[in-house]
Curated annotation (Swiss-Prot):
The modification Omega-N-methylarginine is found at residue 19. This is T-complex protein 1 subunit delta. The modification Phosphoserine is found at residues 36, 184, 202, 444. It catalyses: ATP + H2O = ADP + phosphate + H(+). Belongs to the TCP-1 chaperonin family. Residues 1-29 are annotated as: Disordered. GO terms for molecular function: ATP binding; ATP hydrolysis activity; ATP-dependent protein folding chaperone; unfolded protein binding.
Length: 539
């Protein structure tokens, strides 16, 4: 009878035909995969940890072609990093998601995820099941979002000073921070001009075009209500047109050619003369039709097949006093149409007066010896668009200035989406750590332990801020904890003064959406990494 019991229990019997060994399962493998994923993702977080905050370091990135980028924007650093491990790539995607959702906090979100993964390692080593950790983290996240919302204060879009402070806080950690007094108002004005503050719930940043022009300094950056193109005016005599009627064509003003490659053999000079006369008559007819509509400024889309504007056509346009700008990029067409109210024309037969846009002034502006820009201002079209011209002494400065302005615009977009502000300087994270620790005491068993670990992980932001600013992280975080325990919710690290103070009084503020988005996305990513127990390579 005992033999029967043994065979029924499902234990493999050690007979010659036994299949017990074929069902071998490596119990350690899921744990090894998990720790491998966590350590790879933590390595990415540690790589950009030093670039957090106003005193954070910048990274110099060199690509395969030898092009160099200098930045401390988390999303840009990670995007250009060569990350091979799939779990580490999840953190790169996380940073990208934060960039799309909020536009700021791209470094913080990766650091928070790295810290949460560190907590997971300790919990897993204590034998807690990944599912329990994952569910507890979700509970902690829900409570954390409540805490952040309680801490926030509402903001009105009419409160210009608050918007400026938010944009300035975003710019303070950038290379161009000393120009924040110029770039912050520019960003606020740009957003306010493209939305209706009373009804807007979001901002389409495609309505704000950033044009980069080498030369000058960042002080020369300007906001233009209208259109700015880096292309030069093709005709030398006409550089200014008032009461402009602007046409945009997508066909070429040159002699027609067949699609096939062919050659024409002309046997005598009379035929040659006839060919030239035909070409001249054809182009003159095109130019006359353009002039007939009342058009006095012509924009021509770039053509890759043949010359968009022949010398003969330019000669006729010059005689008829029509200003010409050629080689307009295809991706700029939509913005141009929205700005000046024109419509793109693909064939001369459709070129009529109602296709033209109008503006007070179209002119070519000289930039103190560093090239020229073409500007159209005083547009009568209803399309709400603006252009920001970014200047700088070299390519690296211009590109970093563009990224910084983009971040500032995104911060103001966050305030339009969710009209609430929260203190910066590590204050929300310390408050989260404190309140979640209290919350963990109301829970029981493993959940309480995991929520406590989640709370401790939040302290990484103030600790890193202090470290990067040259302060002692341990004493700084301890003092912050004490101040928050006494009810000083808005106390944070004042990096500029090198100490702890009421951050709201210092006007170091950020949109609530940035913090909420960072916490949510980081927790979701960590939960995803925790749930992975195997990596399978496919052919």
């Amino acid at each position: 009878m005992p033999e029967n019991v043994a065979s029924r229990s499902g234990a493999p019997t050690a007979g010659p035909g036994s299949r017990g060994k074929s069902a071998y399962q490596d119990r350690d493998k899921p744990a090894q995969i998990r720790f491998s994923n966590i350590s790879a993702a933590k390595a990415v977080a540690d790589a950009i940890r030093t670039s957090l905050g106003p005193k954070g370091m910048d990274k110099m990135i060199q690509d395969g072609k030898g092009d160099v980028t200098i930045t401390n924007d988390g999303a840009t650093i990670l995007k250009q990093m060569q990350v091979l491990h799939p779990a580490a790539r999840m953190l790169v995607e996380l940073s990208k998601a934060q960039d799309i959702e909020a536009g700021d906090g791209t470094t913080s979100v990766v650091i928070i995820a790295g810290s949460l993964l560190d907590s997971c390692t300790k919990l897993l080593q204590k034998g807690i099941h990944p599912t329990i950790i994952s569910e507890s983290f979700q509970k902690a996240l829900e409570k954390g979002l409540e805490i952040l919302t309680d801490m926030s204060r509402p903001v009105q879009l009419s409160d210009r000073e608050t918007l400026l402070n938010s944009a300035t806080t975003s710019l303070n950690s950038k290379v161009v921070s000393q120009y924040s007094s110029l770039l912050s108002p520019m960003s606020v004005n740009a957003v306010m001009k493209v939305i209706d503050p009373a009804t807007a719930t979001s901002v389409d940043l495609r309505d704000i075009k950033i044009v980069k022009k080498l030369g000058g300094t960042i002080d020369d950056c300007e906001l233009v209500e209208g259109l700015v193109l880096t292309q030069k005016v093709a005709n030398s005599g006409i550089t200014r047109v008032e009461k402009a009627k602007i046409g945009l064509i997508q066909f070429c003003l040159s002699a027609p050619k067949t699609d096939m490659d062919n050659q024409i053999v002309v046997s005598d000079y009379a035929q040659m003369d006839r060919v030239l006369r035909e070409e001249r008559a054809y182009i003159l007819n095109l130019v006359k039709q353009i002039k007939k509509t009342g058009c006095n400024v012509l924009l021509i889309q770039k053509s890759i097949l043949r010359d968009a504007l022949s010398d003969l056509a330019l000669h006729f346009l010059n005689k008829m006093k029509i200003m010409v700008v050629k080689d307009v990029e295809r991706e700029d067409i939509e913005f141009i149409c929205k700005t000046i109210g024109t419509k793109p024309v693909a064939h001369i037969d459709q070129f009529t007066a109602d296709m033209l846009g109008s503006a007070e002034l179209a002119e070519e502006v000289s930039l103190n010896g560093s090239g020229k820009l073409f500007k159209i201002t005083g547009c009568t079209s209803p399309g709400k668009t603006v252009t920001i011209v970014v200047r700088g002494s070299n390519k690296l400065v211009i590109e970093e200035a563009e990224r910084s302005i983009h971040d500032a615009l995104c911060v103001i977009r966050c305030l339009v989406k969710k009209r609430a502000l929260i203190a910066g300087g590590g204050a929300p994270e310390i408050e989260l750590a404190l309140r979640l620790t209290e919350y963990s005491r109301t829970l029981s068993g493993m959940e309480s332990y995991c929520v406590r670990a989640f709370a401790d992980a939040m302290e990484v932001i103030p600790s890193t801020l202090a470290e990067n600013a040259g302060l002692n992280p341990i004493s700084t975080v301890t003092e912050l904890r004490n101040r928050h325990a006494q009810g000083e919710k808005t106390t944070g690290i004042n990096v500029r003064k090198g100490g702890i103070s009421n951050i709201l009084e210092e006007m170091v503020v950020q949109p609530l959406l940035v913090s909420v988005s960072a916490l949510t996305l980081a927790t979701e990513t960590v939960r995803s990494i925790l749930k992975i127990d195997d990596v399978v390579n496919t052919r």
